[in-house]
From Swiss-Prot:
UniProt entry keywords in alphabetical sequence: Activator, Cell cycle, Cell division, Chromatin regulator, Hydrolase, Isopeptide bond, Metal-binding, Mitosis, Nucleus, Phosphoprotein, Protease, Thiol protease, Transcription, Transcription regulation, Ubl conjugation, Ubl conjugation pathway, Zinc, Zinc-finger
Keyword Transcription: yes
Residue ranges with Acidic residues bias: 408-419
GO biological process: cell division; DNA damage response; mitotic nuclear division; monoubiquitinated protein deubiquitination; positive regulation of DNA-templated transcription; positive regulation of ribosome biogenesis; positive regulation of transcription by RNA polymerase II; positive regulation of translational elongation
Gene that specifies this protein: Usp16
This protein's GO CC annotations: cytoplasm; nucleus
Family (UniProt): Belongs to the peptidase C19 family. USP16 subfamily.
Phylogenetic classification of the source organism: Eukaryota, Metazoa, Chordata, Craniata, Vertebrata
Organism of derivation: Rattus norvegicus
Top EC class of this enzyme: hydrolase
Protein name (database record): Ubiquitin carboxyl-terminal hydrolase 16
ZnF (UBP-type) ranges: 22-141
Domain of life, per lineage: Eukaryota
Cross-referenced CDD domains: Peptidase_C19K
Amino acid sequence: MGKKRTKGKSVPEKASSESTEPMCRHLRKGLEQGNLKKALVNVEWNICQDCKTDNKVKDKSEEEAEDPSVWLCLKCGHQGCGRDSQEQHALKHYTTPRSEPHYLVLSLDNWSVWCYKCDEEIKYCSSNRLGQVVDYVRKQAGRITSKPAEKNNGHIELENKKLEKESKNEQEREKSESMAKENIPLDSASQITVKGLSNLGNTCFFNAVMQNLSQTPVLRELLKEVKMSGTIVKIEPPDLALTEPLEVNLEPPGPLTLAMSQFLNEMQENKKRIVTPKELFSQVCKKATRFKGYQQQDSQELLRYLLDGMRAEEHQRVSKGILKAFGNSTEKLDEEVKNKVKDYEKKKAIPSFVDRIFGGELTSTIMCDDCRTVSLVHESFLDLSLPVLDDQSGKKNINDKNVKKTMEEEDKDSEEEKDDSYMKTRSDVPSGTSKHTQKKAKKQAKKQAKNQRRQQKIQERFLHFNEICTTNYTEDNDHEAETALPGEGEVDTEFNRGSQEELTQTELCANQKDVNGQEEMIESAADERKCPEHPEVKSVSTESDLGSLTSAPECPRDLNGAFLEERTSGELDITNGLKNLTLNAAVDPDEISIEILNDSHSPALKVYEVMNEDPETAFCTLANREAFSTDECSIQHCLYQFTRNEKLQDANKLLCEVCTRRQCNGPKANIKGERKHVYTNAKKQMLVSLAPPVLTLHLKRFQQAGFNLRKVNKHIKFPEILDLAPFCTLKCKNVAEESTRVLYSLYGVVEHSGTMRSGHYTAYAKERTASCHLSNLVLHGDIPQDCEMESTKGQWFHISDTHVQAVPITKVLNSQAYLLFYERIL
């Protein structure tokens, strides 16, 4: 009778009208209130029933340390450990064949309801049937406590405290013994603590990253500065006529930054062994809704969204402060004030705390084989995504295959293959396991091909317009312009005032994904003679299959002309730039220079410049790199592949602007004034030109094979001390003069174990004394010297959500690393 009464009940109309969320269709079959009331009499709460029976022979304190989340079946009242545990008894209970399925479970940690059949959370309110059942369970669990429950809970709490004390004392004893062996003084003020993190529902990918960020003490130091109220900063004026800097009063930081600061303080100061990062995770989900829904996600993508979100909040603070400094609201701004604000924002005198800690710079060097002109492209990064070659696939390196393509292939097929291989090799392939991620990969390939076609059409129109401008202007002023190319290795251009024929640019429009994995449409220019008041942010492709530079002569622009800016949405607004082009702007050659910007506003800034660089040293590094060309199973070899020297030839030839001008001015010049573009063979190499204080390396284990994703389980060796010098330019910044070493010490690892469909993220973190040299480098810009290398001793811990265990360094080095965190020591 009880069962019939329960099934006959319907959801009240009031509840259905109040709830805006769609109700689960398995609610009627998965909910049995009568069975629940019987099962919840004299029951031990928050303990897995199956683990309790299976673990009689196991050590009790060991199980207490793991503390898995417990889920209550709403059909029969069974309590089982969740998906984040090793046994997953709650999931096994659901998959057990029965006459009536047990779909619904209730979390005894956060009181959320989950449907295994729908594989999603069910929303409820207190007025409907599900909400009433949850309220009843919460009362029975002791939220509204009865006297016998108080006694029972008090007894359990006493036992837990005893076990906690014993395990804590044992850990401290082991820790002190290991420290005594290594002769490290225990200093509570400078020591970094290691704690467990509660799993909020398939959030191990989040916990593993947070464990490593919590072991970055310089991040906590900078966040303390950011949180200081009434912070006043000074920004140098962009106009040289103005001598006094602009004083900007910054607002309080954004919610994500505040949540991050609060989390780091809890990890350092909280006396509890386990921290629940609920507020920080909710702020991340607000910035990126893809992390909602308790599905397994990718750790590297989480790190990217987290750092980019905090950086965006910092830039917003500065922009609002500049507006307030001009005494204007954001609603009404005249054009003059808007231009001033933009000029100050482009000055970028205040790098965000994210860039100060994790920010580095890559320089792509391209040299024409004919005229030996060297051009440099600077690109900022927060982490490096390194390719992992799979021996089992039996495929050659995709980049090498693209370089060796011949002109005999059809253009359409060649472009499709280049786009496809580009996504496989150097882009950050989404590594989630959900169907959403796979669909996103398909859309990405289609979008890239579409953008490529659109860019070709825009480029053709732009070429046609500029050829008309150049031809008309050349007929009148051809006798006034003269260009001298004195010799190989350098470009020396002579100007006559008022002659603007030689003010040409090389335009590159390429649809690519940058080193940080963010797709963008990039306009790249090599303008040797541009105005310092309007330096343009430019970029060039970082892939060998995009090595064919496409150039166009451009009419000189007025000093007040609009910029063709790099758009984050990938759209190149070329119309506005063409409206402001003029033909008679006189420019003084002495005032023209190339300016290298350190932009922190875009995730991956790229600056293009033509250098009078010595071709013999343009591709040299701080240290020898050839020793890493053979060992394919090491992180050094991955860096070697990432920074290897490439040949741009055949279908990937370079459109050289210098060779094009030389041919136009030579005896074979076209009488009609038409420019015939010259494509030449070239060399290209990407190296680190700014060593970041904290180096983050991402091993691309999740790779795209067609429309599917696969994981490369190959073990990659990584050292405890990494020398980045073989992969740095000779003029690398943040490196002491005449130094041939750039040393980093490993302090954190994110490991992914399992397969694409069923895996788990864990972290290895190093408890150590905070580095003084790293703090001085980040806070004051003091470059570490050779004689000042610090000790790298410390204790390693393996953290799997709430479980923390001390491990030797050998276990860390044998792990299947997915993310590596290195801190600068020299």
